[in-house]
């Protein structure tokens, strides 16, 4: 999937990945896509909570090599 901005939060635990994702999305224009890479197992739950609060969209989530990858579209 194509993305505009990438944020690698590998090695960081809650709440840091979600705070960084929220800040990154706030700086983006509507329709742009943020790719977030995380090693925090709770990140999936956190990304869903973030998009529910902000109105942004979780387009896709995958995992590979113990990393969780999320694609979020800015509302």
Language-model features: where?
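Absolute protein N-terminus
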Residues: 1-2, 75
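Amphipathic, hydrophobic secondary-structure cores in small proteins
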Residues: 12-57
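Short amphipathic
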Residues: 3-10
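C-terminal structural segments of small proteins and small subunits
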Residues: 48-75
């Amino acid at each position: 999937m194509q993305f505009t901005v990438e944020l690698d939060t590998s090695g960081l635990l809650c709440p840091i990945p979600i705070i960084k994702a929220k800040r990154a999305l706030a700086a983006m224009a509507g329709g742009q896509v943020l790719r977030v890479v995380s090693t925090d197992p709770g990140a999936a739950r956190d990304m869903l909570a973030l998009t529910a609060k902000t109105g942004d969209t979780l387009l896709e989530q995958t995992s590979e090599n113990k990393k969780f990858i999320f694609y979020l579209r800015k509302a």
